[in-house]
């Protein structure tokens, strides 16, 4: 029945992917796409679906107070700031458009899983909460997934996110801290005020020190200055300069080591009477307290599901995803993909159209693993 449903709804899925992809949805501005998803769900019979205060679209299936809950998520937002509709182009069996792989194709497959449940109404051993969530990308800071945890904490047994390629599973959380650092000085005319402190130079000193920090070795840890700006003109001593800085790790203790190193460097320059402003732009948690046997069981279940419908070798690794929120609270969580594509976060992003079929079978098999009596 599963495979028959997917094959029969192949064209509907493709059209849904195209429609979702066409709707712009920068982080924090998912309103239009959320409204479309809610309307689509209502048309399928999901009368209880609703949009919450942070723009998540939620639909609970079989959720009662006496049952544990498993959360399924696929995110609404994309990295692109556009507010005009995107155009989906097709060539050589591929669909091209910004955001089509991350995460519109996976979102479409999750919605089709809901359609299956509403069509056949199977009895479940757990409640399933489906969430088309907001703010997964960048400085969205996992606002959508954090809201779901806060609303249902104590009831969530597992979490599965549809996000990425179908031959990849993420089961470890890469945490991060992101900052904007702004340095201000008196500046002045490059000739007449020569000798005054230059904000660009002072900021560059801070950057050089940050790049000399000795990395912890307990887990992979990285850092990056990804953007700098400042100054006025070639003949002006810069009075303001700023940078965006982040560090990442799979381990919370490594993150703390990097945080302390950052704070110490800033303090060093504050003692030189520099005017420095530090803003925390984002914080994503690492995993903490997850039962390894339960996580391995959830991971292995999905490895077997993927291998049932594809001949691809499954890669298991870490990432910064909606699963971070749940892994940080000890909830076994995995991220699986339901499509093959590439060019993620570029305007040449693409998916292989035919992989939506095995991808949807993978997603649906995951969902149906919670049906009473199913294996």
Regions found by a protein language model. Give the residues of each.
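Short beta-strand segments
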Residues: 73-74, 131-133, 159-163, 182-184, ...
């Amino acid at each position: 029945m599963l495979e028959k449903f997917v094959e029969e709804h192949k064209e509907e899925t493709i059209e849904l992917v195209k429609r979702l992809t066409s709707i712009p949805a920068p982080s924090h501005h998912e309103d239009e796409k959320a409204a479309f998803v809610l309307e689509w769900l209502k048309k399928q019979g999901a009368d209880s679906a609703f949009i919450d205060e942070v723009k998540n679209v939620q639909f609970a299936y079989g959720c009662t107070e006496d049952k544990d809950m498993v959360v399924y998520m696929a995110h609404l937002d994309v990295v692109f700031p556009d507010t005009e509709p995107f155009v989906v182009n097709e060539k050589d069996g591929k669909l091209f458009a910004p955001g089509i792989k991350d995460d519109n194709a996976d979102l479409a497959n999750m919605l089709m899983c809901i359609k299956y449940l509403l069509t056949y109404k199977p009895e479940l051993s757990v409640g399933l909460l489906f969430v088309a969530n907001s703010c997964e990308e960048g400085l969205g800071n996992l606002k959508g997934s954090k809201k779901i945890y806060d609303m249902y904490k104590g009831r969530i047994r597992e979490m599965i996110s549809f996000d990425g390629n179908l031959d990849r599973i993420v089961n470890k959380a890469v945490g991060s801290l992101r900052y904007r650092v702004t340095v201000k000085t008196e500046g002045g005319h490059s000739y007449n005020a020569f000798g005054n402190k230059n904000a660009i130079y002072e900021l560059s000193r801070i950057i050089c020190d940050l790049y000399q920090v000795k990395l912890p070795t307990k887990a992979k840890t990285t850092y990056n200055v990804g953007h700098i700006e400042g100054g006025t003109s070639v003949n002006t001593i810069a009075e303001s300069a700023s940078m965006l800085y982040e560090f990442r790790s799979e381990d919370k203790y490594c993150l703390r080591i990097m945080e302390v190193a950052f704070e110490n460097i800033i303090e060093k320059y504050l003692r030189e009477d520099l005017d420095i402003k530090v803003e925390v732009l984002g914080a994503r948690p690492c995993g903490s307290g997850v039962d390894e046997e339960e996580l391995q069981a959830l991971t292995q279940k999905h490895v077997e599901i993927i291998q049932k419908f594809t001949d691809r070798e499954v890669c298991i690794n870490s990432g910064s995803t909606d699963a971070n929120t749940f892994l940080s609270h000890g909830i076994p969580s995995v991220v699986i993909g339901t499509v093959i594509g590439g060019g993620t976060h570029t305007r040449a992003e693409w998916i292989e159209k035919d992989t939506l079929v095995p991808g949807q079978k993978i997603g649906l098999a995951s969902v149906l693993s919670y049906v009473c009596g199913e294996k």
